[in-house]
């Protein structure tokens, strides 16, 4: 439920829950076997301090949360969404994207909203746009391939309606701070299109799900299992 990153010989840990929610950031040094508390509060259920979008500041910090999506890029750690607290005292699904720079010990709010339960702005499929943003969600799977980050699924908000399971695929470019909707429906609760076993097809798409597992191999994105809010899947998908 907490978020972990690895850069060099250090591991970074943020947030999580024990029925209350945390926003403390810790660093563990594998060389010295020591922990360091870097940022955030030692009090639970804290709201985020967003500051100005795109501007790093010592006062910025994400709100307490769990089940966020994460990746690393250019020796910085990134945090997207999750279930937690916005800039107020309200808890819900988030779609904010944050960058933490270990060199400065500062957070930067990059994109998304400082509110909860925001709907997605998908734009046109396969067309990058500065106005695009995935809907708020928890448990989406994020992986980086060739300096681009890919986000699949989770449980949250599509372009309309209430909370549901998602099966949209997004690309985020850290160099431009722009999102692109690549595949999958822009609505929630959709069944998948499996096609023929082992055969790639443009019409194929995994069913909507969350709590899935993902990894990369040879510049491909793999998704395994997950749940539609009940029985669990045991399918493996390659993108």
Identify the meaning behind each predicted range.
Residues 1-239:
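Kelch-like beta-propeller repeat domains
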């Amino acid at each position: 439920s907490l978020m972990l990153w690895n850069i060099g010989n250090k591991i970074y840990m943020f947030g999580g829950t024990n029925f209350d929610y945390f926003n403390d950031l810790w660093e563990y040094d594998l060389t010295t076997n020591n922990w360091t508390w870097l940022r955030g509060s030692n009090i639970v259920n804290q709201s985020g301090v967003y500051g100005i979008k795109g501007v790093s500041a010592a006062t910025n910090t994400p709100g307490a949360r769990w089940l966020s999506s994460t990746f690393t890029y250019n020796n910085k750690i990134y945090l997207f969404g999750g279930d937690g607290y916005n800039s107020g005292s309200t808890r819900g699904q988030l779609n904010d994207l944050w960058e933490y720079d270990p060199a400065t010990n500062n957070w930067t709010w990059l994109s998304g909203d400082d509110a909860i339960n925001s709907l997605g702005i998908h734009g046109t499929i396969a067309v990058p746009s500065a106005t695009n943003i995935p809907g708020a969600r928890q448990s989406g799977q994020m992986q980086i391939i060739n300096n681009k980050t890919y986000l699949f699924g989770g449980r949250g908000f599509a372009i309309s309606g209430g909370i549901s399971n998602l099966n949209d695929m997004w690309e985020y470019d850290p160099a431009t701070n722009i999102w692109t909707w690549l595949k999958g429906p822009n609505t929630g609760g959709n069944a998948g299109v499996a096609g023929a076993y082992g055969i790639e097809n443009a019409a194929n798409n995994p069913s909507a799900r969350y709590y899935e597992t993902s990894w990369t191999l040879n510049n491909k994105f793999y998704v395994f299992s997950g749940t539609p809010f009940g029985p669990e899947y045991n399918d493996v998908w390659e993108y």
